[in-house]
């Protein structure tokens, strides 16, 4: 049996958001929060890996909750 423990201070979400932001900025020049959320949503839907899907979903929650600095 596995027990899930929420990390106090996770660094995965900000790092993933920053990577997505850099990639989208290189492609489009301008990035909004909606752009990042749409990209993460595509990744969740395209992933066959439950662990990655969970990470992407947690990152969506992180962005929506307003924890990420304004773009």
Swiss-Prot record:
A GO biological-process term: positive regulation of bacterial-type flagellum assembly
Induction summary: Expression is reduced in biofilms and is repressed by a high salt concentration.
Xref: Pfam families: BDM (PF10684)
InterPro entries: Biofilm-dep_modulation_Bdm_put
Name of the molecule in the record: Protein bdm
Source organism of this protein record: Escherichia coli (strain K12)
Organism lineage: Bacteria, Pseudomonadati, Pseudomonadota, Gammaproteobacteria, Enterobacterales
Gene expressing this chain: bdm
């Amino acid at each position: 049996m596995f027990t899930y423990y929420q990390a106090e201070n996770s660094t995965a979400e900000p790092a993933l958001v920053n990577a997505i932001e850099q990639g989208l900025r290189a492609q489009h020049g301008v990035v909004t929060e909606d752009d990042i959320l749409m990209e993460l949503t595509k990744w969740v839907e395209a992933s066959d890996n439950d662990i990655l899907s969970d990470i992407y979903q947690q990152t969506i929650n992180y962005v929506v909750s307003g924890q990420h600095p304004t773009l």
